[in-house]
Amino acid sequence: MPELPEVETTRRGIAPHIAGWRIVDVRVREARLRWPVPADLGETLTGRRLTDVRRRGKYLLLDFDEGTLIAHLGMSGSLRICKPGFPPRKHDHVDLVFEGDICLRYHDPRRFGCLLWTAEPPERHPLLAALGPEPLDKAFDGAHLHRLAAGRNTAVKSFIMDSRVVAGVGNIYANEALFRAGIHPARPAGKISLARYRNLGEHIAEVLAASIEQGGTTLRDFVNESGAPGYFKQVLRVYDRAGQPCRVCGEPIRCVRLGQRATYYCPRCQR
């Protein structure tokens, strides 16, 4: 699943090509995504100028002169820049055609993503209204995590993956941040000290920023806006490394199911 770094990589890649241009055509080849593409999306978007491309958690916000298109890449989605006449591949479901012979193409084999229009400020949309702070913003730190964790018995990994606590920390980066902070993923969230949460908050931001610089993580489906893979997988310390030696102590990395998600940790380094 594309996580925050992959979505941010996409945002940085597509924005220079489409910001400031008007939509001249919308082509919907398959409307059945997680939520159906609005039937009147073409009528709504045609003639509107794109003013900005933002990210909120794992959502991309395409701001037009009036209204916003909210995009989520789901489990396997991607957005790429191409020429409008470039033949669509299988699973290329939606084209946004801009002035200047530019096309933003939405590709999603599993169709778990979405493209939704809102005329209101997107921050009020039900998908975004309850999101926690951005993990790369100054408003997010370990004190925020410690405050929300008080009295909670849920596993800390599930806690930091709750988008109401912090927006956009997915499975890959939760595993990696907890390893760097030396915290066992199953430890109850309410039984972790402020000092350890401060350390964890720093590592969450650190691992996300490092992945963005590497263009994201390629595991199965993710490629960036140009079709190139991300490279952060090459430096993953625990994720997808079950049975391999810990890069710090040599102990074999273990994998368990936690909250129905594959969870990787070092039994020696993480307590």
Swiss-Prot record:
Assembly mode: Monomer.
First and last residue of the signal peptide: none
Reaction(s) catalysed by this chain's protein: Hydrolysis of DNA containing ring-opened 7-methylguanine residues, releasing 2,6-diamino-4-hydroxy-5-(N-methyl)formamidopyrimidine; 2'-deoxyribonucleotide-(2'-deoxyribose 5'-phosphate)-2'-deoxyribonucleotide-DNA = a 3'-end 2'-deoxyribonucleotide-(2,3-dehydro-2,3-deoxyribose 5'-phosphate)-DNA + a 5'-end 5'-phospho-2'-deoxyribonucleoside-DNA + H(+)
Chain positions of all zinc fingers (FPG-type): 237-271
Binding positions (DNA): 91, 110, 152
Note on cofactor: Binds 1 zinc ion per subunit.
Location of the active site: 2-3, 58, 261
SMART domains reported in the protein's UniProt record: Fapy_DNA_glyco (SM00898), H2TH (SM01232)
GO molecular function, one term: damaged DNA binding
Keyword Nuclease: no
PANTHER family recorded: FORMAMIDOPYRIMIDINE-DNA GLYCOSYLASE
Organism: Methylococcus capsulatus (strain ATCC 33009 / NCIMB 11132 / Bath)
Gene that produces this protein: mutM
Coiled-coil annotated residue ranges, if any: none
Family matches, as PROSITE patterns: FPG_CAT (PS51068), ZF_FPG_1 (PS01242), ZF_FPG_2 (PS51066)
EC number of this enzyme: 3.2.2.23, 4.2.99.18
The name this protein goes by in its record: Formamidopyrimidine-DNA glycosylase
Family matches, as InterPro entries: DNA_glyclase/AP_lyase_DNA-bd, DNA_glyclase_Znf_dom_DNA_BS, Formamido-pyr_DNA_Glyclase, FPG_cat, MutM-like_N-ter, Ribosomal_uS13-like_H2TH, Znf_DNA_glyclase/AP_lyase, Znf_FPG/IleRS
